[in-house]
């Protein structure tokens, strides 16, 4: 039972939480369900900070690390200091996806929150981290309580864009499925293949068109 949320989601106590995920939770999930080993972790606010810390301390546990409005300001920008310690390190083609709500939305601590996000974005833009792909997305019409809803949907559209194939394009060029999945595999450094059900449904649709 989680008895101390701040301990489990902030860097000082977060290590044991991710160790539990790696050693106990993930193996249990994989026994219960059919899973690919392409893994995504998503967090918001304080748990967004936890997702960022997972990238820093368990950078092979997941393939994509998603943080919606992460509390990078926590404990005097402690996460930013951890990033500074990792300058030059190889992140093995991991993807860091950060969304944040609009600058116009103000509340206590909001300016400090935006400043830390800008610092991290500047570090990634300079290429301080080897093989770390990053994407920062602002949602000006959202606030801290809603950004994760839009951000999660947009995440799927952006990260897996190659999977969204118009059937009219398939009719014109059946090879587009193979081409798109190969492009997705190159982008995310993981071998993706279309599911059997997708191929069967598409083949039945194509037969009806003929």
Predicted regions and their residues:
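Non-catalytic cap/lid and distal C-terminal segments of serine-dependent acyl enzymes
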Residues: 1-210
């Amino acid at each position: 039972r989680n008895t101390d949320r701040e301990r489990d989601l902030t860097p000082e106590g977060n290590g044991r939480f991710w160790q539990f995920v790696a050693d106990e939770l993930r193996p249990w999930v994989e026994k219960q369900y059919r899973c690919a080993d392409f893994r995504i972790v998503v967090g918001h606010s304080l748990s967004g900070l936890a997702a960022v810390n997972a990238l820093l301390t368990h950078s092979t546990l997941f393939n994509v690390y998603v943080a919606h409005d992460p509390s990078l300001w926590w404990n005097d920008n402690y996460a930013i200091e951890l990033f500074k310690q990792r300058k030059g390190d190889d992140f093995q083609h991991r993807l860091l996806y950060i969304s944040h709500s609009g600058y116009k939305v103000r509340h206590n601590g909001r300016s400090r929150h935006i400043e830390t996000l800008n610092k991290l974005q500047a570090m990634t833009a300079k290429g301080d981290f080897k093989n770390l792909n990053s994407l920062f997305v602002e949602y000006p019409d959202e606030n801290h309580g809603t950004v994760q809803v839009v951000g999660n949907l947009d995440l799927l559209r952006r990260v897996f864009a190659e999977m969204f194939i118009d059937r009219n394009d398939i009719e014109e060029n059946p090879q587009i499925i193979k081409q798109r999945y190969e492009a997705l595999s190159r982008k995310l450094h993981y071998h993706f293949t279309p599911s059997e059900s997708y191929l069967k449904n598409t083949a039945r649709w194509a037969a009806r068109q003929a």
